[in-house]
Amino acid sequence: MFKRKGALKVAMVAGEASGDLLAAHLMDALRAHRSDIEFAGIGGPRMEARGFHSMVPQEKLAVRGYSEVLKSLPELLKIRRRLREQLLEERPDVFIGVDAPDFNLGLEAGLKKGGIPTVHYVSPSVWAWRPERVQKIGRAVNHVLCLFPMEPPLYRQAGVPVTYVGHPLASEIPLEPDREAMRDQLGLPQGVPVFTLMPGSRQSELEYMVPIYLDTARLLLRQYPEAQFLVPLATRATMDQFEQMLYRFKARDLPIRKLFGHAQMAMIASDVVLVTSGTATLEVALTKRPMVISYKLSALTYRLVKRKIKLPYVGLPNILCGRFVVPELLQKQATPQKLAEEMQRLYTDSAARADMEKAFTELHLALKQDTATRAARAVLEVARCH
């Protein structure tokens, strides 16, 4: 896995597209501090483009929901066991688990017990549900890196070393994105409605959300015959899956433009975004675009999750703003008709768009820190002290 003698060995696991982005930024910042550094573990395309050696494809870990995870559990446990054994043998200087707590915390606990310093980057949503996880996380890791300002006090109260680093997207995305320039860059006409559809980064999410989003696009197209639809997809696997679903659901006739990556470009260029709940909702908020949040889980998973959620909303922008800034249509409410109606409302209601933009700008300013540099310093300190 690690090949260069004398280099600082950093092991990482990033379980999905959002973690791939965070880890890629962190790799850049670590290299700015140390040129003699090598990265390996499990990561995505952005990490691999920076020289990361991934033991298995990142998509293997991108599974959501209780019932869905159960189907993949034997393979996930096998991957984690193999990786733990390999890392205990190769002895990296530090391990960084980027998000993916269900996979990473067990791995981190085993590595920490074996004397390898561990850092967990991105706190699980302990402020929303299962707050008892703070103690479990503290036992598994030497340090936690938090993206949101309400998180560090929860860890400090439990005696867990923690650093608030802000969110890297807040530094990467301009405070005032230029929609017209982005449309020119993408070759899109200025005078037509452009809607971005973001069905998710996990293959299991696409299976649930793509059929609904395609029907939503059909309804919007009836209202706006000149409309264009952008669909950014994070990996080759999800690109192929989406292409197959276009055939399966007889949607090849829709004016859909698929983008490999380039999610921010699609967001900025759009009038309204339809997005599956997750980290992408924060990215849309930082681009100041109006959005509708949707999500659909299996009935079993939804019942289990609903009992444990402590907040009235699930979308990150609403959680961070402390109110329903963005409409959320979940489960039985996630119908093409209702989604299309909300998107049409946001497209035509300038006051609603202005309210969202104001809230998103305030959120952007609060999250804008030198995230990757702060995270890199904390990681190097953990590696040095342990």
Curated annotation (Swiss-Prot):
Superkingdom of the source species: Bacteria
Reaction it catalyzes: a lipid X + a UDP-2-N,3-O-bis[(3R)-3-hydroxyacyl]-alpha-D-glucosamine = a lipid A disaccharide + UDP + H(+)
GO CC, one annotated term: membrane
Lipid metabolism among keywords: yes
Keyword annotations of the record: Glycosyltransferase, Lipid A biosynthesis, Lipid biosynthesis, Lipid metabolism, Transferase
Signal sequence, start to end: none
MF terms in GO: lipid-A-disaccharide synthase activity; phospholipid binding
EC number(s) stated in the UniProt entry for this protein: 2.4.1.182
Pathway in which the depicted protein is active: Bacterial outer membrane biogenesis; LPS lipid A biosynthesis
Any one GO biological process: lipid A biosynthetic process
Database matches in InterPro entries: Glyco_trans_19
Function: Condensation of UDP-2,3-diacylglucosamine and 2,3-diacylglucosamine-1-phosphate to form lipid A disaccharide, a precursor of lipid A, a phosphorylated glycolipid that anchors the lipopolysaccharide to the outer membrane of the cell.
Family in the record: Belongs to the LpxB family.
Protein name per the record: Lipid-A-disaccharide synthase
Native source species: Chromobacterium violaceum (strain ATCC 12472 / DSM 30191 / JCM 1249 / CCUG 213 / NBRC 12614 / NCIMB 9131 / NCTC 9757 / MK)
Name of encoding gene: lpxB
